[in-house]
């Protein structure tokens, strides 16, 4: 068991130590791509990443402390690792759309907001984790997130204020822009600072208006849902920002997928996390490039403790959805180091995957009930213990059966 609570230096050292093989491999692949396909030297990459460094220095300087510790622990040069972070996504330094949706209000079985994203991208090892960075004077909000093992960008998340979000490619941008912060880091900034959909929208607007956001030649769909029961989709190109969908009672879809709306509407009024997981495996939703998926159930009363997320690391029809609560301090190392992702590359049957998920869900429901009881009597540490058994049990079941 490990904890991602601590100073940026501590968190960076731990991340770099655990995932050093993937970091070295992916940085090397990035440098070879730059050199062999784009004719760019290491010095040019470093120079082109200066704007990224400046934006991070302004918005979230603790990220630099974390990434420098990652580079040291992994044994890669700091400036090259920063260039990797700046240019890894959408080829920012080299001048697939995902699927996100949310259900709020009477659309869900118990009124708790639901959020989901299927991430379709290169099939790299994935991590699922809770992070709480301790920075004097800043107090970043703790969050659960999914992303690559080789960097700390956030692909989909939910934070302790009860805000869930994602940032997906949204078709061509007629006015490409490369000199800024990619959306995985914009989403991390939102995870650490925003409390609801309104604040998330204002941060997206600020980054766009000030030229801090760089989406290369693709526009972005930002999808958010919060504990208040609001869900929005924001279309963001470099010349246009518009809320394209908003709901306080019903569904929002960042994009239409064959069979998706119909599947969700079939269970409208009774939607559960299991329905979101099922929808992620629909033929019209599940892409060959699907490398991870996240379903979130936001607890509106105690989001910092009882909000739960389930992640499938790897293609969703071959991966188990593993649960994790925001109220934990520790989590299995296998959630972080690519082990769960590796399970998805084994020839396990859909029936076995369903069985593991069902067993884990029975234990999770019991553990959450015990945690709620403990919280009513002000036994927060007892509640945390019950919630931490959820990921432990799911990991043990996977190790036993997969």
Specify the residue positions occupied by each region the protein language model found.
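C-terminal, well-structured catalytic/ligand-binding subdomain of enzymes
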Residues: 1-72, 87, 105-157, 161-402
